[in-house]
Amino acid sequence: MKNFLIYIRVHDIQIKPMQPQIESGAELLTRLNEKPSLHGLEDTLFSEGPQNTDIIEIGGERSSGKTFLLSQMLAKCILPNNYAIKGCNASAILINTDHHFQISKLVELMSSIINTVNISFSEAIDTEFDKTTIIKDSLRNLHIIDCYNNEQFSLILRTLDDIFLDNTKIALLAIDSITAYYWQDCEDNITTIDTYIKKLLKIIKLQTTRFNVATIYTKLCENIHNERKCLTNNIDYKIQLCKVCNSTNFICTLETIQIIRKIHYSILSNGIKWKIDETER
């Protein structure tokens, strides 16, 4: 499956001199309106979204499922919206800094989504070949940038507009994780992680807002129970993942400006399964 992915080498990314770009209002409106919708990306977490340009943070302790949840969202993003699969049929960029992301796991999640779909009689997927073809075609929607140091990461963030211009179907920017080079960047200058992330998001938002692209990033929180902070204006959804003490269960705290919800979940080989309290329905 790896041959069907699009890898962007950092060395191929160049900083180009700024050139004036002339675009009519009609052209701008067309470019923004043609962007695929991310509605249905993860219905349990985003009942009416996420909207394009939203910022979504996935935080949590080690082994709480941060990269797994991100992979599940990427699978939904790049899968088609036909065959009753209800994918977003959108392209996505993954900036891979921690190198915890596994292609094999993404393919497994995509296969699981297809297998569990309630397929209508007229659109039935009859053979394994058809499922494999769908997965291979969908993987072409994912652009992966492997990053190995803070200088490469900075270069990538400042040249995102070139990548967005080359593919108008890109609706999602994923970063795993945004804090991978925190210590490299801040070894000579004491900066809090929140301040560091805020600085990076400012750079990211300048380009994602222009091109109508949502952002999802992961970050490690070692002391999640002691790190309760108010949602900032830069983040639209804050997702905190945590393992319940002396248990195999997990709990997700979802925070927006309007609400704070706690959702229990389990991590299975075929994806994260949410356990919704019937009183919330």
What are these regions (language model features)?
Residues P36-E42, S63-S64, L69, C147-Q152, ...:
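Preference for well-ordered, secondary-structure-rich cores of eukaryotic proteins
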Residues P50, I85-C88, K136-D137, T208, ...:
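Intrinsically disordered, low-complexity regulatory regions enriched in Ser/Pro/Gly/Thr
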Residues I56-I58, I93-I95, H143-I145, I216, ...:
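Hydrophobic/aromatic beta-strand patches that form the interior of the parallel beta-sheet core
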Residues N81, M110-V117, D185, T208-F211, ...:
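Conserved NTP-handling cores and scaffolds of large molecular machines
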Residues C88-E187:
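Conserved inter-motif catalytic segment of the P-loop NTP-binding fold
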Residues D194-K198, K202-R281:
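Phosphate-binding/switch region of NTP-binding enzymes
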